[in-house]
């Protein structure tokens, strides 16, 4: 078993912002392999986030972002349980990251539940017609369609989108990491994206 050194703990702490003891435990659990320790911490954070997901988020802030060319702007309501967290610089930085995601990736909906049923059915119909035009049989279509719908959701729903700075995680993962870090529930309530000449 490889030795867990203070340098390894420090590096893991710098890369993850996790607590010193959490970093030490992660390295011990993963034979001092820093990449595996990062994954372990992320999984642990997501588990922590799941426990906090039911809590009410009555505090928060409106975060804004105007893209450098002045032609795209975003307003985001990001909520937390306490004003202590919502006034934190890292909370605001999270809001800015999410705003930049919205500006860059132009999601249409917050999450899958917010897609109107009629819109989802229309998309399913289009996908089905495309598959039929490709000569796919009904049983093939039934197997292919769920994957195509999942891909569509990952493109149009903010929380399902791959994070533009690190496509190994989604916006939902980013929020769960923040929940684990701050120790309280954080939710994205609303967002609006404006574009000059857009509808």
Curated annotation (Swiss-Prot):
Transmembrane segments: none
CDD domains attached to this UniProt entry: UBA_EF-Ts (cd14275)
Similarity section: Belongs to the EF-Ts family.
HAMAP family per the UniProt record, alphabetical: EF_Ts (MF_00050)
Extent of the signal sequence: none
GO cellular component: cytoplasm
Protein function: Associates with the EF-Tu.GDP complex and induces the exchange of GDP to GTP. It remains bound to the aminoacyl-tRNA.EF-Tu.GTP complex up to the GTP hydrolysis stage on the ribosome.
Domain of life: Bacteria
Cystine bridges: none
InterPro entries: EF-Ts_dimer_sf, Transl_elong_EFTs/EF1B, Transl_elong_EFTs/EF1B_dimer, Transl_elong_Ts_CS, UBA-like_sf
Localization annotation: Cytoplasm
Protein name: Elongation factor Ts
Species annotation: Leptospira borgpetersenii serovar Hardjo-bovis (strain JB197)
Region Involved in Mg(2+) ion dislocation from EF-Tu, residue ranges: 82-85
Any one Gene Ontology molecular-function term assigned to this protein's record: translation elongation factor activity
Gene3D superfamilies recorded: 1.10.286.20, DNA helicase RuvA subunit, C-terminal domain (1.10.8.10), Elongation factor Ts, dimerisation domain (3.30.479.20)
Pfam families in the cross-refs: EF_TS
Keywords attached to this entry: Cytoplasm, Elongation factor, Protein biosynthesis
Keyword Lipid metabolism among record annotations: no
């Amino acid at each position: 078993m490889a030795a867990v050194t203070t340098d390894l703990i420090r590096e893991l702490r710098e890369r993850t912002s996790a607590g010193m003891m959490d970093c030490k435990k992660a390295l011990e659990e993963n034979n001092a392999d820093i990449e595996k320790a990062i994954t372990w911490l992320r999984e642990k954070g997501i588990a922590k986030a799941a426990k906090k997901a039911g809590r009410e988020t009555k505090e928060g802030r409106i975060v804004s972002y105007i893209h450098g060319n002045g032609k795209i702007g975003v307003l985001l309501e990001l909520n937390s349980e306490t004003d202590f967290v919502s006034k934190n610089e890292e909370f605001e930085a999270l809001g800015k990251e999410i705003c930049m995601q919205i500006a860059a990736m132009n999601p249409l909906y917050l999450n899958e539940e917010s897609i109107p049923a009629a819109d989802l059915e229309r998309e399913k119909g289009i996908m089905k017609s495309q598959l039929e035009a490709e000569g796919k049989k009904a049983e093939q279509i039934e197997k292919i369609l769920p994957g195509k719908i999942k891909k569509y959701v990952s493109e149009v729903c903010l929380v399902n989108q791959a994070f533009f700075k690190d496509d190994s995680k989604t916006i939902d993962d980013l929020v769960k990491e923040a929940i684990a870090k701050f120790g309280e529930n954080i939710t994205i309530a609303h967002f609006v994206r404006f574009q000059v000449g857009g509808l």
